Swiss-Prot record:
Function in brief: Probable component of the transcriptional machinery present in the inner capsid. Displays dsRNA binding activity and may play an important role in the sorting of viral RNA and virion assembly. Together with the RNA-directed RNA polymerase P1 and capping enzyme P5, forms an transcriptional complex positioned near the channels situated at each of the five-fold vertices of the core.
Species whose genome carries this gene: Rice dwarf virus (isolate Fujian)
Lineage: Viruses, Riboviria, Orthornavirae, Duplornaviricota, Resentoviricetes
Keyword Manganese: no
Name this protein carries in UniProt: Protein P7
Pfam families per the UniProt record, alphabetical: Phytoreo_S7
Record family assignment: Belongs to the phytoreovirus protein P7 family.
Length: 506
């Protein structure tokens, strides 16, 4: 399901009590389970009865806006700015109107721009289920401001001393006392990730993002809104998201050149056929030096011969430069050394090497001059978290497993094969304990959810133990109206290879 969500994180000590709309309540239930019951004092006297007027939101967030797939389909010409910047947000209006302009003034840019800074828009076409915006303002909010409307009571509590109603005061506080690198953080994520990310935002996630905020603020202080970002903010949603086509197509628009989000990278020494990965999956991987200009390569070549330490320093700086200007896009950077990625501002999601160096030497048989440097890189990789295999192909499979787990929704399309995918939906859910989703994907079989299935796809029902899941009315209607191919298979007693072969022949 495609949807857009805005979340505002006030602080760890903030508690928001309010009546939740049905849509927002549903979103919280997806993330955290049922919301807590109202506090005893959160009641309002209605004639002779006391009626609860507030529910305790289970995390320190305010939902600014929530639009589901139906809304997007009904309003395909709406832009991201139209949706998240709309007055229909469910947060207290005063908080929204105070915080957002302050952030906009601090960054000299529309607040939503930051969401695209973290690879929300991708040129490689992964699924994007949710656009989540998280904002962390400075300390200094009033202790217990209250907002009352006809239908609900909202209570916002913190350890602060500035009244949220006083827009001038809060703007002044933010402008004077907020370090820009702490002012805001943005991230695209799937609905099931919202809970986990909210729990670590103030800690691990925020600390990892700080170097990129510094660069972002520096760039914003020197110029105006990049044209590509401005275009992205005002581009109709229908041009940014594929909606229920049953097949995830690459996005038509390219916005990566001005996108400065944190890149992901893996460490893979020489002789491990990293070029094979980047050429076979060009939309997923990119070699660390690919964006380097001829001038940069020439300067690095000179330093490599005269000053190795200066060479490595400049190498990391060059990577950092191209991370900032978006040259790597949304692809995973393959590097020979950990230091190049970490010093270049790239998040390392995996370290890999072939367990027997003799295999590496065989891979370098046509390049004997690189064996010594390859061995140095190979020996430098050790410790917990290192993934090894003596077979190059099997090691590459482990890399792909890591990529798909760190980048939800990524579609691994073999660049050497036809792009036509078989679209399959397993009625009772994908049997992941028995079969490998990665193997199906690598063989051109895209597994989609029931609400994404079109009549061009295949519906698979298992004859094994029924893994019944609750089917909302909309999905039940989808099943009854499905006119595509249906097949019954004993998936629990088939090997993954047999399942792939069967699906490929349908």
């Amino acid at each position: 399901m495609s949807a857009i969500v805005g979340l505002c994180l006030l602080s760890e000590k903030v508690v928001l009590s309010r009546s939740l709309t049905d849509e927002v309540s549903k979103l919280y239930k997806l993330n955290r389970g049922n919301v807590k019951e109202p506090r005893k004092y959160a009641t309002e006297r209605m004639s002779t009865q006391s009626k609860p007027v507030a529910l305790q939101v289970p995390v320190s967030t305010i939902i600014l806006d929530y639009k589901d797939e139906d809304f997007i389909k009904q309003n395909p010409t709406y832009s991201a700015m139209d949706i998240i910047g709309s007055p229909s947000n469910t947060a207290p209006q005063t908080a929204f109107q105070s915080i957002m302009p302050s952030l906009s003034a601090l960054f000299n840019t529309p607040f939503i721009q930051g969401a695209f800074r973290h690879r929300v828009i991708s040129s490689m076409g992964p699924e994007i289920s949710y656009l989540v915006m998280v904002i962390g303002p400075p300390s200094g909010f009033m202790d217990t401001p209250m907002y009352r409307t006809v239908n609900h009571l909202s209570i916002l509590m913190s350890n602060a001393d500035v009244d949220l109603i006083d827009i001038i005061a809060i703007n002044s506080t933010m402008a004077k006392s907020t370090k820009l690198v702490f002012a805001s953080t943005f991230q695209a994520m799937l609905v099931n990730d919202v809970y986990d990310r909210c729990m670590v935002l103030v800690g691990i996630f925020l600390s990892q993002a700080l170097p990129f905020f510094r660069n972002y603020v520096n760039v914003q202080s020197k110029g105006s809104l990049p044209p590509a970002v401005a275009a992205c903010l005002n581009t109709p949603i229908k041009e940014l998201f594929s909606m229920g086509s049953g097949k995830r197509e690459p996005l038509a628009l390219e916005f990566r050149k001005d996108n400065e989000g944190q890149c992901l990278g893996i460490v893979l020494p020489k002789g491990h056929e990293g070029d094979t990965l980047s050429s076979r999956y060009p939309a997923v991987f990119i070699n660390e030096s690919e964006p380097f200009s001829d001038e940069e390569r020439s300067e690095l070549s000179k330093l490599k011969r005269t000053d190795p330490d200066a060479y490595e320093k400049l190498y990391s700086e060059t990577i950092s430069k191209h991370v900032s200007d978006g040259s790597y896009g949304n692809r995973v950077i393959i590097s020979h050394k950990m230091s190049r990625l970490s010093n270049g501002g790239v998040k390392i999601i995996g370290r890999f090497k072939i367990s027997d160096f003799n295999t590496v030497k065989k891979n370098l048989s046509s390049r004997p001059g690189e064996v010594d440097s390859a061995k140095e890189q190979w020996e430098a990789l050790s410790g917990n978290g290192l993934v090894t295999d003596n077979n190059t192909s099997m090691l590459h499979d482990k890399i792909l497993d890591t990529i798909t787990s760190n980048k939800p929704g990524v579609v691994l399309r073999d660049g050497n094969k036809k792009s036509d995918n078989i679209v399959v939906c397993f009625k009772n859910g994908f049997p992941n304990k028995k079969h490998s989703l990665l193997q199906l994907t690598k063989n051109g079989i895209s597994v989609v959810s029931l609400d994404e299935l079109t009549d061009a796809g295949i519906l698979v029902e298992s004859t094994g133990p029924d893994r019944v899941r609750r089917s909302p009315k909309a999905l039940a209607n989808k099943l009854s109206s499905f006119k595509g191919r249906k097949v019954t298979l004993d998936v629990d007693n088939m090997s993954t290879e047999a399942l792939i072969q069967k699906l490929s022949t349908l």
